Curated annotation (Swiss-Prot):
Organismal lineage: Eukaryota, Viridiplantae, Streptophyta, Embryophyta, Tracheophyta
Organism: Oryza sativa subsp. japonica
Repeat is among the record's keywords: yes
Protein name: Calcineurin B-like protein 4
GO MF annotations, alphabetized: calcium ion binding; kinase binding
Binding site for Ca(2+): 161, 163, 165, 167, 172
Family of the protein in this entry: Belongs to the calcineurin regulatory subunit family.
Family matches, as InterPro entries: CNBL1-10, EF-hand-dom_pair, EF_Hand_1_Ca_BS, EF_hand_dom
A biological-process GO annotation: calcium-mediated signaling
Site positions (Involved in dimerization): 140
Pfam families: EF-hand_5
Gene designation: CBL4
GO cellular component, one term: plasma membrane
Amino acid sequence: MGCASSKQFKRPPGYEEPAVLAAQTTFTVNEVEALRELYNKMSYSIIKDGLIHKEEFQLALFRNSRKANLFADRVFDLFDLKRNGVIEFGEFVRSLSVFHPKAPKSEKTAFAFKLYDLRGTGYIEKEELREMVLALLDESDLHLSECAVEAIVDNTFSQADSNGDGRIDPEEWEEFVKANPASLRNMSLPYLQDITMAFPSFVMHSEAHD
């Protein structure tokens, strides 16, 4: 009897109590439980081991498991807090919390900075910004000329690099975001505010009504 019970209630890899995650994030307990269902769908979509691998992450959030994209890679890497190549449930909830409309702007600002700081130096350099702009355009299927991309990069640096050292530090980035709030528009996902009702219509469309 005891063996059957332990199998029935075996917890998946990286399981954390919803109440604990709710206390540490912007989500409510009910929202965390809804995210658990979403996580289960994602983590069993390809490899089926209860962990989210990069292919599954890209398929769910970026609609493509094979197309290489720097933006998708960066988001995955930042969600993978343990740096072990997979996203566990706790990592998924904590990282996704940053995108909640009610998450503090300071958290969104810090996450966006890390997104652009490709080499983890603590600064955003011109080449890093250029690479991310190109990746974001590619993800959106938008195509700009090389001159237009350079203009975006140069304009950003002319506004953000206040001390003129050729790179953007966290303080400069914070001031830039305050002056240009639209720069964080991709850091809020409105459906997370209604996750218990909206799930899972925003991802995994082909599997949402199994």
